[in-house]
Amino acid sequence: MPMPLIDAVKLSVAMSWLLGSFVATFTGVFVAREIRSLAIAKAKYEHLRRIDGLSGLLNRRAFSEALDQTDGNASLAIAELDWFKSINDAYGHSAGDFVIRAVADILCHFANDPHVTARLGGEEFGLIIQGDTIQQRFERIDMIRRSISDLRLHFDGRLISTSISIGVAEISPERRPEVVYAAADRALYRAKANGRNCIVHEMTHGPQPLKQSIQAVS
């Protein structure tokens, strides 16, 4: 028996409403998932954009941003592995990559949050050591140097050792980041000129201990 017209209209309206609700719900869920996926993808991209692929540390760009945002009570250290090219030449670039990752692990161990660690490129690294006193920050950085010097790495049946030279400068609100960086870079040059595998602070002149240098300028 045919359905009365009024009932058919009511059924049609009900079905349309149900179908519309289903479509709207499905569309809403789909859109929400797509937005979430895009947000996750963007976050991953931003993370990867700031990370050095080999070491897992921050890259130079992210380190520069961190330095710009550090306004004081911190030390900047610029470090360079000694004779790194000879490792690549003697053992191959895979061995060099292995050394870079091992050094990065040490940096992360001794200079994790709130400190900042980065691979600036090649065999060069950057650190921003926060808080404490100048002397304590210097001692932490030198602990990193000694730990790297003590490394004995086994790679492809061969034993590899390395060392690192470090230049340190002080960050303060009165100094522009590029000025601090240049001071740390000059200190690094002096560390390399002094025979490498050492740490030189911008306040240090010749063999004068850092503690005496700090007292002289305080």
Language-model features, listed with the residues they occupy:
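Conserved nucleotide-binding and Mg2+-coordinating catalytic segments in signaling enzymes
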Residues: 45-65, 79-93, 98-101
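A short pre-motif secondary-structure segment
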Residues: 116-119, 123
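Short regulatory alpha-helical coupling segments
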Residues: 46-47, 58-76, 104-112, 130
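Catalytic core regions of nucleotide second-messenger enzymes
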Residues: 119, 148-164, 192
